[in-house]
């Protein structure tokens, strides 16, 4: 309680003094602030931010977008202090960005100036009419887009000629003004807008006709109502306004066509012609002599739209006349386009086609019109085109991605009549493979693409004209994927060596290309003495220099596509360091800001003190209530036992605080009988002991395992496990002898403990005496051999008493993690309960202070997996420094069988003790120079063997070694250990050079394991006599798996046959 009060007072002082120590502590200032930018949509953008402080590593950076903290994903992420946005979107990323630099020591925050991000895009353009009369024509180019800080470029075109400010034409930004327009200004007006995002033309232009503007008149005439004959006298001086209907067309008042002007002959009613042949449409006309000087136009229309026209009478300098009965023509009413195939003959009005194409089919009509008069129309004629049989477009070869759900290859044929499309494989009249079909449109559909779909496919199109075919090649490829992507941002010291991994899989085999800051790297443009491009794609840089710092990108690609990942390399130079500085505040507002800061700080500190005092009172009340309950329970128990228990625990109250994992079992040992009296009220201190149900003598057992921390020496870290670091070191010989003596005492204590607990204990504690009897009866499958081995061990132990013992030390760092503590106790109980040659020995437990140390037996050759890799030539030496540097020869089949047999014996001992291992693999076994293999439990899941573990349901699991029921239901039994043992034998015959199912990702392994579709096969070098029993180890049904005794018998028989 006193410590808590002192801690609260210190915290209050720190909070109170925080506003006055900003200048001399770890305050920060920006040396690089983010700048406002305009980015083209779908491009990437980087906002740079850098602050300095003392020390320089005391900063944490955050980014705000429009006042809200950014949630990072694959598109928006932070690289160091900088913010990177991939594929900018105008709907999500536009706005204000602020960089926040926060000191981790003082909590002070500094915000950078706001940087604005604007997106440049360009969607569409259209021409709008703002005004049109006899004096001027005003058009506007309306653009859907944005150009940021740059101006939008607008270009105007009349027909196909580009316009500029000249004579009566003025261009002002988006507007076009034509002053005093004449017939020479007639035409189709379009605009083109362009910026950094691209260039777009208006989809619809504006057609201006000067003659129509002059002759247009309103058809709205003033008239009286039906029941009104006279105007009221009061209306004599009124002004009446006549308006046309809003949105309607204003038509010109046209006179009937003059006599004598007529069409003599129009096009035929039905004309049928083959595609590619010439065609002629007739239109004979007569013009009287008195009308020769009038302006008369001959027009051809297709499907109601103007196609061609020509002036027959007096010609104007320029213009299109007055087509379409006085209505203005826009893009929808005209088909005027440059086409050399179409020729309109002025002499006889004939429209001729050089070669007919399919799009020429339609309804044609000839029209004759005199200026200011109604048009004369011929009867329509239908042009029908017999289209040639052809592919539109031609089918092309294609690469299909393996395992794609659906892939399509199109084959579209056109012709008259409509052709029928068929597909064949490797020639004509051959059937298509499975999961390949053809739809009604002639599209070839592949479902669940696999390697059997490779080949040549022929598309055959037939109709009455004949048949045509096209052959395409279908290749099944695997898109490139990163098997080992580049590392996350790395920091490396100058003149050291860095390895940036980049490995890829795919079919065809992907090529790997490195670049630095978007500049390609190769052996020609790099220092070959420092840069090495390994065969698997990894980039190695030796003797790192300051100029090597940057962004390294790895691009993988094959015919199926490209993928790219980046890694940021930061080089720490010897001169790197932070200089102290003092932040100067303005003198004008300094006093007010300081006063406000002090008031806020004192208010927060006062509220915090009130909260702490309240918690202290509540904790004191809880502790007194708990003591009262414990005293009440102690009175009900035997008096002598109560006094002894209190003396063992209350005498050292700090021990339980320092030992959160094992101290609970001590208290349970004192109050062990309270669990059987049926009292529903149980204290918080016994919660963990209720789950473990250890005996009340467990404290005495742990005391027998106690080892002084000073007995350990030469500790070298070899990795990190799930609950702490793992070391290799040496244990004094005297402590090893004491541990061997304590083993005998612990066996007696176990029997005594079981007799006291009776039948009310758990399965693990009640069977210890039975286990010892079985161990002494020597009735298991390896009893006879163990008798001989024990004699050899006694001789070896006498020789080793004079030298220190090589040990493995597992540290429990996560003392507050209940799950880690539970697993620590499980491994401790497992190794403490077993005494077998195939299992590593438990020498003791160091629990004087945090972290706890679990001291286990270790061997001179280290873990089995590294030994297998060394014999396969994959590594140079074994794990430990004491191992020999002489290359090891490859293992023979007899040696592999011997290793598997020893592991089976050790696992059979675990089974007979009614324990499960849960992580059996070659990495968790050790081997000595005497070729003795023992089952151990390093479990280096955090670094060395992190690839062999996967986080599933908030736990790191070796999913490639686990049975399906372990992944689905978290159910571990001896049968699940047998499943893992089958994988271990697979590793042994493969020399541990491969991962099980290395062609599948971890997620795919989990999915197939849960579906029961994960297929296992034995290694190629496995003896025939073992294949059947090893395959049964991987049975989905646990009851169909063999026992370890059966596996040991099969291995023993195979060893005899191999000899």
UniProtKB/Swiss-Prot annotation:
<keyword id="KW-1003">Cell membrane</keyword>
<feature type="domain" description="Ig-like C2-type 3">
    <location>
        <begin position="258"/>
        <end position="377"/>
    </location>
</feature>
<dbReference type="GO" id="GO:0005886">
    <property type="term" value="C:plasma membrane"/>
</dbReference>
<dbReference type="Pfam" id="PF07679">
    <property type="entry name" value="I-set"/>
</dbReference>
<comment type="function">
    <text>Acts as a calcium-dependent, homophilic cell adhesion molecule that regulates neural recognition during the development of the nervous system. Component of the repulsive Plexin signaling response to regulate motor axon guidance at the embryonic stage. Also component of a receptor complex that is required in the adult visual system to innervate the lamina layer; specific targeting of R1-R6 axons.</text>
</comment>
<feature type="transmembrane region" description="Helical">
    <location>
        <begin position="598"/>
        <end position="618"/>
    </location>
</feature>
<feature type="glycosylation site" description="N-linked (GlcNAc...) asparagine">
    <location>
        <position position="42"/>
    </location>
</feature>
<comment type="similarity">
    <text>Belongs to the protein kinase superfamily. Tyr protein kinase family. Insulin receptor subfamily.</text>
</comment>
<keyword id="KW-0325">Glycoprotein</keyword>
<feature type="domain" description="Protein kinase; inactive">
    <location>
        <begin position="712"/>
        <end position="1055"/>
    </location>
</feature>
<dbReference type="GO" id="GO:0035260">
    <property type="term" value="P:internal genitalia morphogenesis"/>
</dbReference>
<feature type="glycosylation site" description="N-linked (GlcNAc...) asparagine">
    <location>
        <position position="456"/>
    </location>
</feature>
<dbReference type="GO" id="GO:0004714">
    <property type="term" value="F:transmembrane receptor protein tyrosine kinase activity"/>
</dbReference>
<dbReference type="Pfam" id="PF07714">
    <property type="entry name" value="PK_Tyr_Ser-Thr"/>
</dbReference>
<dbReference type="GO" id="GO:0030424">
    <property type="term" value="C:axon"/>
</dbReference>
<feature type="compositionally biased region" description="Polar residues">
    <location>
        <begin position="665"/>
        <end position="693"/>
    </location>
</feature>
<keyword id="KW-0677">Repeat</keyword>
<feature type="glycosylation site" description="N-linked (GlcNAc...) asparagine">
    <location>
        <position position="429"/>
    </location>
</feature>
<dbReference type="GO" id="GO:0007155">
    <property type="term" value="P:cell adhesion"/>
</dbReference>
<dbReference type="InterPro" id="IPR003599">
    <property type="entry name" value="Ig_sub"/>
</dbReference>
<dbReference type="InterPro" id="IPR001245">
    <property type="entry name" value="Ser-Thr/Tyr_kinase_cat_dom"/>
</dbReference>
<feature type="disulfide bond">
    <location>
        <begin position="141"/>
        <end position="191"/>
    </location>
</feature>
<dbReference type="GO" id="GO:0072499">
    <property type="term" value="P:photoreceptor cell axon guidance"/>
</dbReference>
<dbReference type="Pfam" id="PF13927">
    <property type="entry name" value="Ig_3"/>
</dbReference>
<feature type="disulfide bond">
    <location>
        <begin position="49"/>
        <end position="99"/>
    </location>
</feature>
<dbReference type="GO" id="GO:0031290">
    <property type="term" value="P:retinal ganglion cell axon guidance"/>
</dbReference>
<keyword id="KW-0732">Signal</keyword>
<feature type="glycosylation site" description="N-linked (GlcNAc...) asparagine">
    <location>
        <position position="524"/>
    </location>
</feature>
<feature type="region of interest" description="Disordered">
    <location>
        <begin position="739"/>
        <end position="781"/>
    </location>
</feature>
<dbReference type="GO" id="GO:0007169">
    <property type="term" value="P:cell surface receptor protein tyrosine kinase signaling pathway"/>
</dbReference>
<comment type="subunit">
    <text>Interacts with plexA; component of a receptor complex that mediates the repulsive signaling in response to Semaphorin ligands.</text>
</comment>
<keyword id="KW-1133">Transmembrane helix</keyword>
<dbReference type="InterPro" id="IPR007110">
    <property type="entry name" value="Ig-like_dom"/>
</dbReference>
<feature type="disulfide bond">
    <location>
        <begin position="411"/>
        <end position="459"/>
    </location>
</feature>
<feature type="glycosylation site" description="N-linked (GlcNAc...) asparagine">
    <location>
        <position position="469"/>
    </location>
</feature>
<feature type="disulfide bond">
    <location>
        <begin position="502"/>
        <end position="554"/>
    </location>
</feature>
<feature type="region of interest" description="Disordered">
    <location>
        <begin position="639"/>
        <end position="695"/>
    </location>
</feature>
<keyword id="KW-0524">Neurogenesis</keyword>
<dbReference type="GO" id="GO:0090090">
    <property type="term" value="P:negative regulation of canonical Wnt signaling pathway"/>
</dbReference>
<dbReference type="GO" id="GO:0046982">
    <property type="term" value="F:protein heterodimerization activity"/>
</dbReference>
<dbReference type="InterPro" id="IPR013783">
    <property type="entry name" value="Ig-like_fold"/>
</dbReference>
<dbReference type="InterPro" id="IPR000719">
    <property type="entry name" value="Prot_kinase_dom"/>
</dbReference>
